[in-house]
Amino acid sequence: MKIRPVILCGGSGTRLWSDKKHHQPKQFIDFGNWTLFGKTLERIQNSIFDYPIISTNKKYIREIKKHLRLKSIKKYKIILEPAKRNTAPAILSAALIKEIPENQPLIFLTSDHLIERTNLFNKSIKKHQKYLTCLLYTSPSPRDSV
């Protein structure tokens, strides 16, 4: 059974920008020819993954759909977060979607992390796929890396 990716894409980027009026969430910042959200979508365009579920708020719908079109992803589900409540409620709401088979493994990915070695990321998931029921992928915070 394929793994269902759930992309957490509701962050507003307020910790990144001091001027809250003129900021863009880091997952949508254009770094020339790519964004972090775009890279996340590329990572899941692999035969081990089912179509994505994207958890976000209504401010980002247009940007998300633009990225989905650019990556030629036609099948997806968007969950709207009614209020900013951090990660746990977004994970819970995605896990409760009735159309997801009970035994389908889920992987929760943040939309604003850079994973440069996509081949190793996918290889590791594929290697352990038969043991997975749920996986939350996070990377260390900058202060943990020092």
Segment roles from a protein language model:
Residues 1-7, 14-18, 34-108, 114-119:
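Conserved N-terminal catalytic core of the sugar/cofactor nucleotidyltransferase
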Residues 12, 33, 145:
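Donor nucleotide-sugar binding loop of glycosyltransferases
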Residues 118-129:
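Short alpha-helix within the catalytic core of nucleotide-sugar-dependent glycosyltransferases
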Residues 131-135:
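Conserved donor NDP-sugar-binding/catalytic core segment of glycosyltransferases
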Residues 137-146:
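Single conserved hydrophobic/aromatic residue that forms the stacking wall/gate
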